[in-house]
């Protein structure tokens, strides 16, 4: 069973450890220094495997295809040989823009089969087009030796159309396509450092949606990102009354996801510090992914 504390530690504060091989300057979330060219990133959290990224082309430019190679190394600097499938994928890559208008959740499997050679090298490829200039957080979730890890970096993308500031919309009732979604909290004030329970309610055409479907072996995938891009948390939802033997939906655990559920999905989050956070939620209905976004203030 996965170690709960490992997941929490890395979700609270972890930059990508190792190298980011890109000519475009990048800034570690906890070290606001640029690292142009082939420069080694300072290690913020030495625990666990080291994640190394390389981009092709090296200069990241808005609107152009980018091949991102992700390598995972053990403490000896060798390819990590004990990676574990987590929520149906070898690893999860979350990309979000600083203004929160861009969000992607992708996997190596989206671009082809994961081969034995890839596993042996612990090296995987994803492709992405950053749509506009500015700062993006790139989060990577994976499991090794039965422990879950979340690491991230901030990348700066060059281009002519820079992004603006996030729109501060704190409404708890929103419409996403044909779906009306509400977000409720046990406490009106979301507190930092404590487990906060949030509840999503889904309806369509005035009727509760009771036939939501599992998405990557979870009721919901939630990416919680602070407005300063200083925190990245990846959590998973729970159906009220569903028995969980794991970590409140966090990462990989032993739980049974019903074939159909709704209209409520619960989400437990520990916000590491005060500030503003965007919560991106992904659920599946009738074969399609519904992306929700809620901005919350944490005191």
Features from the language model and the residues they span:
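Bacterial N-terminal signal peptides that target proteins for export
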Residues: 2-14
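Bacterial N-terminal signal peptides
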Residues: 11-23
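Intrinsically disordered, low-complexity terminal tails/loops enriched in metal-binding residues
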Residues: 18, 25-299
């Amino acid at each position: 069973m996965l170690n709960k504390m490992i997941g929490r530690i890395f979700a609270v504060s972890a930059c990508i450890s190792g190298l980011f091989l890109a000519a475009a300057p990048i800034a570690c979330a906890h070290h606001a220094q640029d690292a142009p060219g082939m420069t080694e990133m300072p290690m913020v959290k030495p625990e666990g495997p080291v994640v190394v990224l390389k981009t092709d082309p090296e200069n990241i430019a808005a609107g152009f295809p980018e091949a991102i190679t992700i390598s995972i190394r053990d403490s000896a600097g060798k390819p990590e040989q004990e990676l574990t499938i987590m929520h149906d994928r070898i690893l999860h890559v979350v990309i979000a823009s600083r203004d929160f208008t861009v969000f992607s959740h992708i996997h190596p499997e989206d671009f082809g089969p994961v081969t034995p050679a890839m596993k042996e090298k612990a090296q995987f490829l994803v492709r992405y087009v950053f749509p506009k200039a500015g700062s993006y957080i790139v989060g990577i979730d994976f499991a090794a030796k039965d422990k879950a890890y979340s690491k991230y970096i901030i990348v700066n993308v060059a281009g002519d159309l820079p992004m603006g500031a996030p729109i501060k919309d704190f409404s708890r009732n929103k419409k996403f396509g044909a779906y009306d979604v509400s977000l409720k909290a046990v406490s009106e004030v979301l507190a930092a450092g404590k487990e906060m329970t949030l509840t999503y309610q889904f309806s369509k055409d005035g009727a509760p949606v009771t036939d939501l479907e599992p998405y990557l072996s979870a009721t919901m995938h939630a990416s919680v990102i602070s407005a300063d891009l200083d925190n990245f948390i990846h959590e998973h939802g729970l159906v009220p009354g569903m028995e969980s033997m794991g970590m409140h939906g966090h990462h990989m655990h032993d739980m049974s996801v019903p074939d159909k559920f709704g209209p409520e999905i619960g989400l437990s989050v520990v916000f590491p510090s005060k500030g503003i956070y965007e919560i991106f939620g992904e659920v599946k209905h009738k074969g399609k992914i519904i992306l929700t976004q809620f901005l919350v203030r944490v005191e």
